[in-house]
Regions:
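A short, Lys/Arg-rich alpha-helix, primarily the initiator
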Residues: 1-39
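Conserved hydrophobic/aromatic packing and binding residues within compact polymer-binding modules
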Residues: 18, 32-33, 44-52, 84
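Recognition helix of helix-turn-helix/homeodomain-like DNA-binding domains
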Residues: 37-65
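DNA major-groove recognition helix of helix-turn-helix
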Residues: 53-56, 69, 85-88
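Short Lys/Arg-enriched helix C-cap and helix-to-coil transition segments
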Residues: 60-72, 100
Length: 103
């Protein structure tokens, strides 16, 4: 990822925020994945969630988050997707402003 690739950083910050909030609510990874994609087999859903959170096996990069999946994540947490996006955006801005000060 480019040093200042804001959209990519935003997406990763959104995923990190969702992951953190799911953990705070006590959801296990597979349980949360099943909430996001209930029509999928649990193992398939868990693999997809892992690919979004970490890295996909074929590419070595995290899978991108679709708008539909972002809405599913927010709904599963009982939160507004716009609110989560604002928090993620601010987290990236803070990290970038902190990085600028360190250099």
């Amino acid at each position: 990822m480019e040093k200042n690739d804001f959209p990519q950083m935003f997406e990763r910050a959104f995923v990190a925020l969702v992951t953190e909030r799911a953990a705070v609510r006590g959801y296990k990874k597979g349980e949360f994945a099943a909430m996001l994609w209930p029509w999928m087999k649990p193992k398939v859903a868990a693999t997809r969630w892992n690919a979004i959170r970490d890295k996909a096996i074929p590419t070595g990069k995290p899978q991108s988050v679709t708008i539909a999946d972002a809405l599913r994540m927010a709904d599963a947490l009982g939160e507004d997707v716009g609110y989560l996006m604002v928090i993620a955006k601010e987290n990236v801005r803070k990290s970038l402003s902190g990085a600028d000060k360190k250099e």
